[in-house]
Amino acid sequence: METVRRIVKGTLLLGFCTGIGGDLWVLVAPGQERRLEMRMNYPEANPPMLAEAHKRNEMVLKVIEESAKTNENMARRSPWSS
């Protein structure tokens, strides 16, 4: 009987804590308007920043392809900025 009481007590405590966590999540989470505003500020929504990210990714892929073709350690090449 003691085991059943412990299981029920533990289950109720777990459910209570989960309920409090869910309520706090709802209180802290941003509203619909705030989520839309945040979505507009993503880099993907800004064309100049998106173009810059594409350019940076192309440069990284170029270096990776170049390093795959040679046995040289690209990390030790100087200068790094070129």
UniProtKB/Swiss-Prot annotation:
The keyword Transmembrane applies. Residues 30-82 are mitochondrial intermembrane. The chain crosses the membrane at residues 7-29. It is found in: Mitochondrion inner membrane. It is a single-pass membrane protein. Its main location: mitochondrion. Residues 1-6 are mitochondrial matrix. It holds the Pfam family UQCC3. GO terms for biological process: ATP biosynthetic process; cristae formation; mitochondrial electron transport, ubiquinol to cytochrome c; mitochondrial respiratory chain complex III assembly. One of its GO terms (cellular component) is mitochondrial inner membrane. Keywords: ATP synthesis, Membrane, Mitochondrion, Mitochondrion inner membrane, Transmembrane, Transmembrane helix. Associates with the ubiquinol-cytochrome c reductase complex (mitochondrial respiratory chain complex III or cytochrome b-c1 complex). Belongs to the UQCC3 family. Required for the assembly of the ubiquinol-cytochrome c reductase complex (mitochondrial respiratory chain complex III or cytochrome b-c1 complex), mediating cytochrome b recruitment and probably stabilization within the complex. Thereby, plays an important role in ATP production by mitochondria. Cardiolipin-binding protein, it may also control the cardiolipin composition of mitochondria membranes and their morphology. This is Ubiquinol-cytochrome-c reductase complex assembly factor 3.
